[in-house]
């Protein structure tokens, strides 16, 4: 990640911009002018496209700092992308196999009408009858698991290498815990993964 501090002094307020970017050495800079436009500058100082990035704007007034805005931040410091693609596939495939094993038990129990589990090519589809469909798939370029749920909507999960589990990259909820909870809500089946 690239870290860059920009300073701009005005009459009484000193503004600092702390910027994080993980996209090919691009740095997103807030043009602190009256227009407040965003521009993106690469290492050659040439204008390029704006990329989604983690932004923290901190304003200092009389030596007191106040956080104004924060967006799209990963809250868990243990989640770093798995660099080895083969290791990533092994970890995700093992997780999906566990899900399929546990969910097939639910399917065989016939406690949830219309319940089906399908898994192939890195995509796990869980059909919960007329209540909706889950799609859980691996995203190799991002080294993430992506989730689409009829209850909680879309989510992205990063691998926590310390806890050895997948966690939501926004709120830190473990993937297994979320799946257990939602299957329990939809199917009234107490599943433990």
UniProtKB/Swiss-Prot annotation:
Pfam families: Frataxin_Cyay. One of its GO terms (biological process) is iron ion transport. The keyword Metal-binding does not apply. One of its GO terms (molecular function) is 2 iron, 2 sulfur cluster binding. One of its GO terms (cellular component) is mitochondrion. The keyword Membrane does not apply. Its main location: mitochondrion. It catalyses: 4 Fe(2+) + O2 + 4 H(+) = 4 Fe(3+) + 2 H2O. It is found in: Mitochondrion. Its EC number is 1.16.3.1. PROSITE patterns: FRATAXIN_1, FRATAXIN_2. It comes from the Eukaryota. InterPro entries: Frataxin, Frataxin/CyaY, Frataxin/CyaY_sf, Frataxin_CS. Keywords: Heme biosynthesis, Ion transport, Iron, Iron storage, Iron transport, Mitochondrion, Oxidoreductase, Transit peptide, Transport. Residues 1-72 form a transit peptide. Belongs to the frataxin family. Monomer. Oligomer. Promotes the biosynthesis of heme as well as the assembly and repair of iron-sulfur clusters by delivering Fe(2+) to proteins involved in these pathways. May play a role in the protection against iron-catalyzed oxidative stress through its ability to catalyze the oxidation of Fe(2+) to Fe(3+). May be able to store large amounts of the metal in the form of a ferrihydrite mineral by oligomerization. NCBIfam families: FeS_CyaY, mito_frataxin. This is Frataxin, mitochondrial. The lineage of its organism: Eukaryota, Amoebozoa, Evosea, Eumycetozoa, Dictyostelia. The gene is fxn.
């Amino acid at each position: 990640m690239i870290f860059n501090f920009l300073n701009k002094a005005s009459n009484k307020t000193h503004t600092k911009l702390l910027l994080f970017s993980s996209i090919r050495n691009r740095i997103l800079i807030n043009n602190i002018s009256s227009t407040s436009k965003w521009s993106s500058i690469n290492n050659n100082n040439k204008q390029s496209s704006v990329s989604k990035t983690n932004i923290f704007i901190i304003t200092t007034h009389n030596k007191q700092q106040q956080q104004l805005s924060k967006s799209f931040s990963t809250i868990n410091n243990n989640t770093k992308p798995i660099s080895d693609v083969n290791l990533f596939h092994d970890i995700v495939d093992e997780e999906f196999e566990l899900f399929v094993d546990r969910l097939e038990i639910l399917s065989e129990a016939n406690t949830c009408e219309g319940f089906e589990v399908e898994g192939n090519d890195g995509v796990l589809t869980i059909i919960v009858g007329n209540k909706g469909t889950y799609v859980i798939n691996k995203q190799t370029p991002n080294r993430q698991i992506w989730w689409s749920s009829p209850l909680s909507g879309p989510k992205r999960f990063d691998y926590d290498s310390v806890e050895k589990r997948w966690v939501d990259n926004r709120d830190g909820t473990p993937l297994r815990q979320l799946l257990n909870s939602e299957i329990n809500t939809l199917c009234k089946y107490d599943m433990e993964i």
